[in-house]
Amino acid sequence: MAEGGRAEPEEQERGSSRPRPPSARDLQLALAELYEDEMKCKSSKPDRSTPATCRSPRTPPHRLYSGDHKYDGLHIVQPPTGKIVNELFKEAREHGAVPLNEATRSSREDKTKSFTGGGYRLGNSFYKRSEYIYGENQLQDVQVLLKLWRNGFSLDDGELRPYSDPTNAQFLESVKRGETPLELQRLVHGAQVNLDMEDHQDQEYIKPRLRFKAFSGEGQKLGSLTPEIVSTPSSPEEEDKSILNAAVLIDDSMPTTKIQIRLADGSRLVQRFNSTHRILDVRDFIVRSRPEFATTDFILVTSFPSKELTDETVTLQEADILNTVILQQLK
């Protein structure tokens, strides 16, 4: 230290070499460089491709609550649609579902347009089955087509059923386990069900176009004059056919019933009858609805247990076939 308290030049030089505290600007620059390095690191990582099963942008999962309040009860996160469909196919395969051969499908479904996507068939129901063994006639089997869309699923040509509905979720859970859903068992009255699945998860639900031709005859209307057609997708040639030219006179003052008739060509007719109508009236209705069967020898049998309706003079009530499914079999 020199006189007057002034520092020697050597001491001033040492004092000026001390590090100064970082300023706010220095901190901002450091943070900016750190952020740029992190972004470069992320961009250098290879992008993982979206699985082939996810064909639409991923949507956030729906959140459901089983309690009365949002913060009360069990919290359930519903997976996106693609995950639902993929897991359904995966678990169905694990429970014995097999790919449906296109040749087999086309030979079995003459009235269905050929589908080029994947499909799986599930086996028998989880119920205890009867010891009755069906023969080779495949008409004993009831075919149901399950179409899985982006926004829900449909059965045959039915309406869209959202995945978020608890009843629909229970239906799909049964399919996942390789079981025939209870809903289908009740529908077919114990007949064997073959369930086919089609993957349409890259499409929104498409409502099938049904074509009806009204009855053009004359007469006094007592009830339903035209049959209800449960249609399957058909070719343009088949759509041009007239299948609604039969009339069944219904007495609404008497008990009525609905009979579903599965024809030998795979199509179905549903018609309302009085319980006093006879088996012969059902046969006559089939022939008048589908004239191509007028010269064909066929029989009518119940679906389950299989029994031929030999006495066609008995009433529907006496034959115990009210609100049931009967099958047409060619001789």
Curated annotation (Swiss-Prot):
Sequence ranges assigned to domain SEP in this UniProt record: 141-206
Domain UBX positions: 252-329
SMART domains, sorted: SEP (SM00553), UBX (SM00166)
Primary site of residence: nucleus
Keywords per UniProt: Acetylation, Cytoplasm, Cytoskeleton, Endoplasmic reticulum, Golgi apparatus, Nucleus, Phosphoprotein
Compositional bias (Basic and acidic residues): 1-16, 37-48
Modified residues (Phosphothreonine): 59
Family: Belongs to the NSFL1C family.
Functional summary from the UniProt entry: Adapter protein required for Golgi and endoplasmic reticulum biogenesis. Involved in Golgi and endoplasmic reticulum maintenance during interphase and in their reassembly at the end of mitosis. The complex formed with VCP has membrane fusion activity; membrane fusion activity requires USO1-GOLGA2 tethering and BET1L. VCPIP1 is also required, but not its deubiquitinating activity. Together with NSFL1C/p47, regulates the centrosomal levels of kinase AURKA/Aurora A during mitotic progression by promoting AURKA removal from centrosomes in prophase.
Oligomeric and partner information: Interacts with VCP. Does not bind ubiquitin.
Official protein name in the record: UBX domain-containing protein 2B
Organism (species): Mus musculus
Gene name per UniProt: Ubxn2b
